[in-house]
């Protein structure tokens, strides 16, 4: 099963559009760009934090994002990061500057950014081979980000956990609160200063990697179809708006907690091993990384659980919205506590 994210195709699924943009409004806004005439616009599936539209003009296909929470001051980091990665050959959206040379504009009272549209679609049910590709592309992202000089503290790191807990304190059940507080206390004892640090994506879930399909002739295309016997290739990585600086292995843990997650809140061992091998083909993880791995899996589960609790308790009002299961990541965190996963048993 795949969740369609193809540029310009019709979507028959739940969507999230918090700020509605009319065709007339977008046409007027695009006069600030040298992109030709507007041909088509459409709300995009799966956005939770922001409003997204596919935009097709006479000169190409793009994605328009209206930022519902972020201020203008925060956004140049993300635009410059994507520009940096794209310039180094990494497959990610390229920000489009307006006629004044600016990436960030304003539309309907919200900061807005236009980026190029990548080929492919996100997957829901994944294979070990795809997990291996995900590990490889994550390693490529970390390598491409090495020369990026701007700095941004991980926006979903420990400082955020603590502040967000205060918002949730009156909402969550006592047992949930105890688990969150206990885990935050546990994580505070592990700074991971001895691990490699750099730019992390921070949110490399299944809906943020696009796979191109392999057609019946063996060629690659991005049209819907059955590729159960062929896995396709990654067309690109999207949604960098949780990026920041942190331990690189934390990014692997966040990714593993989604790509290898089973419905029973355990990680698929075969998929996890494939992801770890894809990320580091020589399997040479340092002793510090091996020791940190089960701790980082817990940190990653906590981060996602808190985020999903927030989406459910404090939903944005939108034209088309949906929520995600927070309890799954509570159970995953408890699983990581009760049965820690160790790299040595996987590679």
Explain the meaning of each model-derived region.
Residues 2-42, 327-347:
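Regulatory N- and C-terminal appendages and interdomain linkers associated
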Residues 19-32, 149-153, 161-202, 206, ...:
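An alpha-helical support segment within catalytic cores of ATP-dependent transferases
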Residues 45-57, 63-64, 95-96, 185-250:
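Active-site acidic catalytic loop and adjacent metal/ATP-binding pocket
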Residues 167, 304-347:
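ATP/Mg2+ or Mg2+-diphosphate-binding catalytic cores
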Residues 249-284, 299-316:
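Active-site activation/catalytic loop segments of kinase-like enzymes and analogous catalytic loops
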Residues 285-297:
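All-alpha amphipathic helical-bundle segments outside canonical DNA-binding/catalytic cores
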């Amino acid at each position: 099963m795949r969740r369609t994210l193809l540029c310009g195709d019709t979507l028959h699924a739940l969507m999230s559009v918090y700020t509605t943009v009319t065709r007339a409004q977008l046409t007027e806004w695009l006069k600030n760009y040298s992109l030709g005439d507007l041909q088509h616009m459409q709300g995009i599936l799966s956005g939770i934090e922001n409003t997204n539209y596919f935009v097709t003009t006479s000169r190409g296909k793009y994605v328009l994002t209206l930022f519902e929470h972020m201020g203008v001051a925060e956004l140049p980091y993300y635009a410059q990061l994507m520009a940096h990665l794209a310039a180094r050959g990494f497959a990610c959206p390229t920000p489009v500057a307006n006629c004044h040379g600016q990436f960030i504009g304003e539309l309907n009272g919200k900061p807005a950014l236009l980026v190029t549209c990548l080929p492919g679609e996100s997957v829901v049910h994944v294979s070990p081979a795809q997990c291996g590709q995900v590990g490889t592309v994550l390693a490529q992202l970390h390598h491409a980000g090495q020369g990026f000089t701007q700095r941004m503290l991980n926006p979903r790191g420990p400082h955020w956990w603590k502040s967000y807990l205060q918002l949730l304190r009156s909402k969550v059940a006592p047992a949930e609160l105890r688990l969150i507080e206990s885990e935050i206390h546990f994580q505070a004892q592990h700074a991971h200063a001895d691990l490699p640090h750099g730019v992390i994506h921070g949110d490399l879930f299944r809906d943020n990697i696009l796979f191109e399909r392999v057609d019946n002739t063996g060629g690659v295309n991005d049209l819907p179809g059955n590729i159960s016997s062929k896995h396709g290739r990654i067309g690109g990585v999207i949604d960098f708006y949780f990026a920041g600086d942190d331990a690189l292995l934390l990014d692997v843990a966040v990714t593993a907690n989604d790509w290898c997650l089973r419905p029973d809140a355990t990680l698929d061992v075969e998929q996890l091993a494939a992801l770890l091998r894809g990320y580091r083909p020589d399997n040479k993880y340092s002793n510090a990384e091996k020791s940190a791995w089960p701790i980082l899996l817990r940190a990653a589960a906590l981060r996602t659980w808190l985020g999903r609790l927030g989406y459910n308790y404090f939903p944005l009002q939108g034209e088309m919205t949906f929520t995600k299961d927070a309890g799954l990541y509570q159970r995953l965190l408890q699983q990581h506590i009760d049965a820690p996963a160790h790299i040595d048993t996987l590679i």
